[in-house]
């Protein structure tokens, strides 16, 4: 064979071998990167799953309050309507009585109220709170404006039902929150406010207030005779310090 041809063939073999070696090296590098990326993705996904499990566990293992603890009503009954009249000027005094706008009650009372709400929602209604926990100072303000023990508890007699977080002033509305006929407005100090509904001409209003009354009484509440909207838990709570 021609020596020049031999040299040329040898060069070609060397170049081909070099290209093959380079190709193999490139493939190994690509595979290595791919494996690292896959491992990183898997590790990140595992970390996210672990974090989610921790969050879920924290939520599901949240300690349930004791029955005598004050709680935010809407936390446990999200679909209830709240319009605290004494947090506005829209009440019989014409002045704001307290500053907070959320309803608070004892947890045991809220559990009962949740059952009432469930029962009413099945009938196309919803509860609406006008007043719940009422600070003692607020009771003093109300007495100064309207010192009539038939409608306002005298603070001189100590802590009363609203001050202990087991009493609620409440009405019912349509499920969408729209107003329906009731015997009177809130804090109406006429005969229309009491539970003798014989003087109420509106039959629908009487029917609605009886729906409220039956639902409340069936779930552990008693109504105050002089005010159709006033209900107290049958369980009485001791006075404790609480600031909304």
Positions of predicted regions on the chain:
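Extracytoplasmic/secreted cell-surface and envelope-processing proteins
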Residues: 138-139
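Sec-dependent N-terminal signal peptides of Gram-positive bacterial secreted proteins and lipoproteins
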Residues: 4-24
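Extracytoplasmic cell-surface/polysaccharide-interacting catalytic and binding patches
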Residues: 22-130, 145-244
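Segments that shape or occlude catalytic/ligand-binding pockets
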Residues: 135
């Amino acid at each position: 064979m021609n020596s020049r041809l031999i040299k040329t063939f040898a060069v070609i073999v060397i170049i081909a071998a070099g290209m093959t070696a380079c190709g193999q090296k490139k493939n190994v590098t690509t595979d290595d990167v791919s494996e690292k990326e896959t491992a990183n993705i898997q590790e990140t996904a595992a970390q996210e799953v672990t974090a989610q499990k921790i969050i879920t566990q924290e939520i599901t293992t949240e300690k349930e309050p004791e029955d005598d603890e004050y709680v935010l009503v809407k936390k446990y009954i999200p679909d209830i309507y709240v319009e605290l009249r004494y947090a506005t000027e829209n009440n019989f005094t014409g002045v704001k009585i307290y500053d907070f706008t959320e309803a608070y009650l004892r947890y045991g009372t809220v559990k009962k109220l949740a059952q009432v709400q469930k029962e009413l929602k099945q009938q196309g209604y919803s509860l609406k709170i006008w007043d719940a926990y009422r600070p003692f100072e607020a009771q003093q303000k109300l007495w100064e404006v309207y010192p009539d023990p038939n409608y306002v508890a005298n603070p001189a007699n100590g802590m009363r039902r609203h001050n202990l977080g087991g009493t609620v002033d409440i009405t019912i509305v349509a499920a969408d929150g729209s107003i329906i006929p009731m015997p009177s407005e809130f804090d109406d100090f006429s005969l229309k406010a009491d539970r003798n509904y014989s003087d109420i001409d509106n039959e629908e209003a009487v029917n609605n207030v009886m729906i409220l009354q039956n639902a409340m009484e069936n779930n552990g509440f008693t109504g105050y005779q002089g005010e159709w909207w006033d209900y107290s838990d049958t369980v009485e709570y001791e006075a404790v310090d609480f600031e909304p």
